[in-house]
């Protein structure tokens, strides 16, 4: 069987023509070579540009190559092709098309069945396993890093009645045997702290609200337990549907909502791995792609639906999805969904459609931060839940080496070239504040001999997916991005994150640099700072101190000046949030005794009962949050998050 890396490399760059003129020019930048080598990846926005010289990667023949990145599982409309879990023909049989989907006269490879109250996994399929899990030598299928064992020392705080003891390994029981096999094929060797607690919490029928640092395994934290319980207990019976589209309506058992197209696609990819050979058929829907194709994919069967709120609302209104059988509701990156203005859609989906009541389903909320308004959402959506805080919520990982450089705006490009020239050949993400700057910087780097591509909200879905695929494969190892790629994306082996433009909000800085140092790996985060960024000085100093990083003298000096002038800040003030250690708002001053901190390998301390009043919502937050919010407000800064930058 050919190594999947070789297959991807063969597909990654299609030659734009013949002859040496379409090959990388020898000595032209880091990717120089002779005329027999393949052409370099060309970003989508540059493919139709005509150049008069052989600069960049055009070689002696001049002009940029027009090869396009291939090997993606997206069709020409930019939609995910559900090839593994697809099918044809119409049926209500769960073992084939399933749950309002299409029929096949024989079982599809990689898809199991639920028959007569029993789970019947399908036979193993070598081709599918290579596609889903890759090979052990392929670093793009990385599951853990050299510092993974350090997660055992991360403190874990769990509050609520009857907190179960954490698991210490992936075993059956408590997990289903098939899921353990899929986890093993994914080369996960041990659970992260959030996974150690989420598995027994969900197995015990409890709701969960989890805060964990970025890169801590939140996706597995909800996929592992809900899939395991689904394999053990099976689907809910399908009620008879009525209406014009009743025969085409799907009835998923699991619903996962997340804010962006990239994040739901990533969750879907992970779900395919862990649902392999099971009766659970994953599907994904999101805006910006052909809804007709997504409906056709749904009709092939859908038991686990991953969706953005806007597209899901559309499908519900069209009568193509029923939520009546939902057993598990997952809200991932809940704070970002509210930042993007999705709260009305989320409340409509959860409270006004046919989803079972909070008492008749299990609900899990995951995110890196949980300000007050998110905790209020939890009060409405969750019942008798356990609040889980892993590590210092809202802080950065010590696996990331942070470097703050003082660079004036006009010197940024020169310093960036020095950094890229001196660094090792690893994947690098460069963040800018505007879409125009992202395109400008990608063009500049390309002209200087660095294969770069850009991703932001103005790119079509097809272009975005092609650019991400090129970046992950190394065909274009430099990705210039706006905030569209800053949250949730789990791209293995990102060695360096560069904040070319610092964000106005320190939380956004945290999530940007969290693209490196994931799953216990080490990474470097470099930020270009000057006096135009004074609004985040206080937050930067606190983050560096918390993560045991060096605070540059110039930053400390500007921090003292800003503090004296009363204009520090950079925190998101409009939402009443806090970046201090998040605590369960139910543990107010008027009720509930608090226990101690546990660690990820032991049981949690014994927490008292949650207060019955629950009125003192802010009492659990650190006092410094108030000074952050007031400073932010007095500086005259509004909410820096723009929905348009994400879409």
UniProtKB/Swiss-Prot annotation:
Biased composition range(s): Low complexity: 609-647
Binding residues annotated for ATP, in chain numbering: 212-219
Region entry Disordered, spans: 1-122, 566-647
EC number(s) stated in the UniProt entry for this protein: 3.6.4.13
Major location (coarse): cytoplasm
Enzyme kind, highest EC tier: hydrolase
Domain Helicase C-terminal residues, every copy: 399-559
Reaction(s) catalysed (UniProt annotation): ATP + H2O = ADP + phosphate + H(+)
Family: Belongs to the DEAD box helicase family. DDX3/DED1 subfamily.
Coiled-coil region: none
Motif Q motif: where in chain: 168-196
SMART domains: DEXDc (SM00487), HELICc (SM00490)
Keyword Cytoplasm: yes
Pfam families: DEAD, Helicase_C
Residue ranges, compositional bias (Gly residues): 16-35, 55-70, 566-579, 589-608
Record remark: domains: The Q motif is unique to and characteristic of the DEAD box family of RNA helicases and controls ATP binding and hydrolysis.
Protein name: ATP-dependent RNA helicase DED1
Compositionally biased intervals (Polar residues): 1-12
Keywords: ATP-binding, Cytoplasm, Helicase, Hydrolase, Initiation factor, Nucleotide-binding, Protein biosynthesis, RNA-binding
Stated role: ATP-binding RNA helicase involved in translation initiation. Remodels RNA in response to ADP and ATP concentrations by facilitating disruption, but also formation of RNA duplexes.
Domain of life: Eukaryota
Localisation per UniProt entry: Cytoplasm
InterPro entries the record matches: DEAD/DEAH_box_helicase_dom, Helicase_ATP-bd, Helicase_C-like, P-loop_NTPase, RNA-helicase_DEAD-box_CS, RNA_helicase_DEAD_Q_motif
GO cellular component term, pick one: cytoplasm
Domain Helicase ATP-binding, chain residue ranges per copy: 199-388
